[in-house]
Amino acid sequence: MNIVPGKNAVSNIPFDHARVDRLMEEAGIDVLLATSKHNTQYLLGGYKFIFFAARDAIGHSRYLPIVVYEKGGPDHAAYIGNRMEGGEHQNNPFWTPNLHTACWGTLDAANLAVEHLGKIGKQAARIGIEPGFLPSDAYALIRHALPDAKLIDATDMLERMRAIKTDAELEKLRIASELITDSMLATIRWAREGSTKAEIIEQLRREETNRGAHFEYCLLTLGSSHNRAASPQAWKKGEVMSIDSGGNYHGYIGDLCRMGVLGEPDAELEDLLAEVEAVQQA
């Protein structure tokens, strides 16, 4: 599904645009082209397109969402997305006044960004880009189409933008952390003597998924081995298990580590745990 590119009234900008304007001014940036999933999600108030949640590739190219934001000009903001995102807008309208859900790959997305910059008179502006998240073919198109523009690495500016969390973001981080902790404790209770690392990791994945988190990874050790990769190694009585896992909750990562022992801990382990407790309570 696609909708005709159009312009809507600015309403409910989902971030502190005055602060973003200040950060852009300090970085010498006139207009942003945000292309990473985490920064486009932030600038769109938490939105991400579920179709490309797990994989960006499509055909011979890839998904490239672009948020265009002009310093001091939110009425010139635009979102450039995939053709299928027109339906997303119909159900939950994007805040950006300009919307172009007309892309399948990187080049058509970059071309629409160039066209929009021309319409708002920013062909020769200082344009902030994300070099690590801008495919080379899209970069080359932008560079060729805008020879008078100055392309600036906006990575640090965007990191500073997201550094101060809102109350809503902190709540998501809290929920993400609690979901991961609860999943780990449930997995440790589930595991038995003979449970392999691969089986334990798969159980943790199920626990996190059932609680509403998107499983990212699990690094697991058993006994004296420091190898954290999945394997047929089985948990033995008296061995310590260390689970380090990250799970995604609406774009925010809960990343924690918990430990358990199969059976009763020995005296040495009790002493070590007491030392850890003493440090934590100090």
Sequence positions of predicted segments:
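Active-site neighborhoods and metal-handling regions in enzymes and metal-associated proteins
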Residues: M1-A282
